[in-house]
Curated annotation (Swiss-Prot):
Origin species: Bacillus anthracis
Taxonomic lineage of the native organism: Bacteria, Bacillati, Bacillota, Bacilli, Bacillales
PANTHER family hit by this protein: GMP REDUCTASE
One GO BP annotation of this record: 'de novo' pyrimidine nucleobase biosynthetic process
Protein name: GMP reductase
Covalent S-S links between cysteines: none
Length: 327
């Protein structure tokens, strides 16, 4: 599989700029039948997204994926979003009642535009069976399947009918899969993305390990169509979860999707809880991401996201931060 590296080991090399202002650069991306303002999607986690944020994102042309931790609310959520002319994008698991849920959607003629099959180890017969089940009953839904970390997994899920695959096993900030199990793409997520993208014939969503806005551009360079981000989206005014004050500073809770806080029990725990500094409004963060990505495109010598895909890069093994951690 060649060179192993992660986000902080890579620098992209500038090409001649062809724009007068970064505002001429277009950050939009198409996934399935819809076009979105940014190639970025907040993680489908309980401390990152709720109905209110999903609505805000959809109304403003950002992609979103609703989490699956209140399964009984999904049908009303789909109805509500579609009645307002917005896309419905939901998550499902692979347990037996999820099969019934998909059939119920079909029976009620409810077709979410996007369905994400979301389990920790997505290279499994359970996921393959669920992809086929959704494609049989809801053929118009765009199916994202994951999470995976190998080219074999990408190929198998695509062959089963997945419209996109989500790549990343445990690189997230509140994910401790790497510590608890010894497995995953933590520490080499960017190389894993590159490896998987070479095998893919359909879009890839890079999931986890993003610590700076520049990492979004690096993900695009190594084959991602969309980039899923947790920690950078945690801690906003609008974010779910409680706000606490400590030493005069405001913090918000952020926990992983397989943490005991989310599961309500200490069994098969692969997530942890942390408090992140309060970041102000979500809108400001999205605008900053867009502006930074416009700058990335201008450094890549183009006007569209695709220009980033062909730039040269170097592996800087001493880390680009030289010990100065920015996160």
């Amino acid at each position: 599989m060649g060179n192993v590296f992660d986000y902080e080991d890579i620098q992209l090399i500038p090409a001649k700029c062809i724009v007068n202002s970064r505002s001429e650069c277009d950050t939009t991306v198409t996934l399935g039948k819809h076009k979105f303002k940014l190639p970025v999607v907040p993680a489908n986690m309980q401390t990152i997204i709720d109905e209110r944020i999903a609505t805000y994102l959809a109304e403003n042309n950002y992609f979103y994926i609703m989490h699956r931790f209140q399964p009984e609310k999904r049908i009303s959520f789909i109805r509500d979003m579609q009645s307002r002319g917005l896309i419905a994008s939901i998550s499902v698991g692979v347990k037996e009642d999820e099969y019934e849920f998909v059939q119920q959607l079909a029976a009620e003629h409810l077709t979410p535009e996007y369905i994400t099959i979301d389990i920790a180890h997505g290279h499994s017969n359970a996921v393959i069976n669920m992809i086929q089940h959704i494609k049989k009953h809801l053929p118009e839904s765009f199916v994202i399947a994951g999470n995976v970390g190998t080219p074999e997994a990408v190929r198998e899920l695509e062959n089963a009918g997945a419209d996109a695959t989500k790549v990343g096993i445990g690189p997230g900030k509140v994910c401790i899969t790497k510590i608890k199990t010894g497995f995953g793409t933590g520490g080499w997520q960017l190389a894993a993305l590159r490896w998987c993208a070479k095998a893919a014939s359909k879009p890839i969503i890079a999931d986890g390990g993003i610590r700076t806005n520049g990492d979004v551009a690096k993900s695009i360079r190594f084959g991602a169509t969309m980039v899923m981000i947790g920690s950078l989206f945690a801690g906003h005014e609008e974010s779910p979860g409680e706000t606490i004050e400590k030493d005069g500073k405001l913090y918000k809770e952020y926990f992983g999707s397989a943490s005991e806080f989310q599961k309500g029990e200490k069994k098969n725990v692969e997530g942890k809880k942390m408090f992140v500094e309060h970041k102000g409004s979500l809108e400001d963060t999205l605008i900053e991401m867009e502006q930074d990505l416009q700058s990335s495109i201008s450094y890549a010598g183009g006007t569209k996201l695709d220009s980033i895909r062909t730039v040269d890069y170097v592996v800087v093994k001493n880390s680009i931060f030289n010990g100065d951690k920015v996160y």
